[in-house]
């Protein structure tokens, strides 16, 4: 971690201990050292004891990331709204600097303080 410029993680390592604690410690260590943090919440329902547990860990990841790549379905699951509003919540409430919401065959929505949409 000391030698990297960016640390990327996803929710698969947040499902169970001891991987969860190790991932959280790595993210916190990297943040203290000024590394860029990238997060991809990949909701795989069968891996979680409950959807509440999944949401809790996904939100932890969002609040600790600078760059977020999330699907439209995952954003809907967490925030109950469309991609533009979800991106605003991730930027403003969670503190990310850049959000990419994938939209399948419709391309993706990318937002920092300016936004654009591209077809795949």
Model-derived segments and spans:
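Structural recognition of alpha->loop->beta junctions
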Residues: 52-77
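Conserved phosphate-binding/catalytic loop of the ribokinase/pfkB sugar-kinase fold
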Residues: 1-21
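Active-site beta-loop-alpha junctions enriched in small/polar residues
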Residues: 12, 42-46, 73, 104
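Conserved phosphate-binding/catalytic region of the ribokinase-like
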Residues: 28-32, 83-120
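Hydrophobic beta-strand scaffold residues
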Residues: 37-39
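Helix C-cap/helix->beta junction micro-motif
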Residues: 32-33, 64
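Charged helix-capping and loop-helix junction motifs
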Residues: 20-26, 51-59, 81-89
């Amino acid at each position: 971690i000391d030698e990297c410029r960016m640390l990327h993680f996803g929710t698969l390592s947040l499902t169970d201990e001891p991987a969860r604690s190790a991932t959280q410690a790595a993210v916190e260590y990297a943040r203290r050292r000024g590394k860029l943090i990238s997060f991809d919440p990949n909701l795989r329902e069968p891996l979680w004891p409950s959807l509440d547990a999944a949401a809790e860990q996904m939100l932890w990841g969002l609040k600790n990331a600078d760059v977020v790549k999330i699907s439209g379905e995952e954003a809907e699951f967490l925030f109950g709204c469309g991609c533009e509003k979800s991106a605003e919540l991730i930027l403003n409430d969670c503190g990310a600097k850049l959000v990419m919401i994938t939209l399948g065959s419709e391309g993706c929505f990318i937002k920092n303080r300016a936004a654009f949409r591209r077809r795949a």
